[in-house]
């Protein structure tokens, strides 16, 4: 029997609401403000949380100057259509693209994330 349910990924960032809005729009999850951070939630309870960090420094992937703290892989049906959509939300396409079945982007706070074909 599991001890817990629905683990939450917590992402450090300089503007929790802005980053929650970005991921909430990308995943079509609702945004919920809490007293000390912002969460996005799916209808079935999955959660990603965003917390404010005063001296936030984004990762510098793929180098280790400022190591990657985490990344999210999101499965999509069409890489080109998904790329257009995330760029419109404020993502940036990373110059380093190491594969053909996925694409690497940076969220508005500089965290890498990937759009992946299933």
What role is predicted for each listed range?
Residues 64-87:
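Mid-chain, well-packed structural core segment of small domains
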Residues 3, 7-53, 81-104:
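Core segments of cupin and vicinal oxygen chelate
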């Amino acid at each position: 029997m599991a001890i817990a349910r629905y683990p939450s990924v917590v992402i450090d960032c300089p503007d929790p609401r802005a980053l929650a809005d970005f991921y909430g729009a990308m995943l079509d999850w609702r945004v919920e403000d809490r007293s000390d951070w912002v969460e996005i939630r799916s209808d079935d309870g999955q959660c990603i949380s965003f917390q404010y960090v005063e001296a936030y420094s984004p990762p510098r992937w793929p180098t280790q100057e400022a190591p990657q703290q985490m990344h999210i892989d999101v499965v999509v049906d069409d890489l080109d259509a998904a790329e257009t959509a995330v760029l419109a939300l404020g993502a940036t396409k990373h110059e380093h693209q190491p594969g053909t079945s996925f694409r690497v982007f940076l969220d508005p706070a500089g965290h890498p994330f990937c759009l992946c074909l299933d």
